[in-house]
Amino acid sequence: MYDTMPGATRESLRETIMECERVGHAKGLAAGLSTALAAAGATDPPGRIAALPTDQVPEGAAVVPNAMAEQEGISFVRWPESSAEPALDSLAVLLGAVRIGVTRNLMEHAVTHLSGRTSGGEPTVRKQLVLGAIADAMTAADAARECLLVAGDVPAAVVDTHDRLTELDWEATKLLGASGFITDSPARAGYVSRLAANCWVPRGDT
């Protein structure tokens, strides 16, 4: 996997992973994806659809409409079929890091949301079950990061990390209650990040 970033050392890869997470958390999915694509030198997706920052869509490209993705600054572009066998590369790892940043942001929104609601005369966020769910989610995000750092060259581990992040986003969305299921919810970024991962993370024989 790391051969796709010529000259990169394990330490520099670690720094790139952390930077992709930081950008995803601070600036959002589109900025994070842009950082990951540039670092990985990615060109062709493993399938027929590429997820790209909207401002990087090639002129004249056929774009698959998706309102939620558009609001996140992401476009899904039809791509010419490649004769190369799909293979997991460094972009799958870096996109995983971006998704961790997006997931952390979603969890923080959930904590803020619950802090402003009360149940039984106290903030909902203080309820034992809610505290446990938040703690579990944060621990899982840390575990996902560690997996990318130490097992990023193991395709099955990278695919599993993306699956776990999808589950984490769903759990955080449920903490937002009904507001997590409207278009303008912060959960939108988590949903679109899953679609982006579906474009760039091949799921062949891992």
Question: Positions of the model-derived regions?
Answer:
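C-terminal helix-coil-helix/basic helical segment that borders enzyme active sites and/or dimer interfaces
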Residues: 122, 138-166, 170-183
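Glycine-rich phosphate/cofactor-binding loops in nucleotide/flavin-utilizing enzymes
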Residues: 1-37, 72-76, 176-206
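Generic detector of well-ordered alpha-helical segments enriched in charged/polar residues
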Residues: 14-18, 30, 34, 111, ...
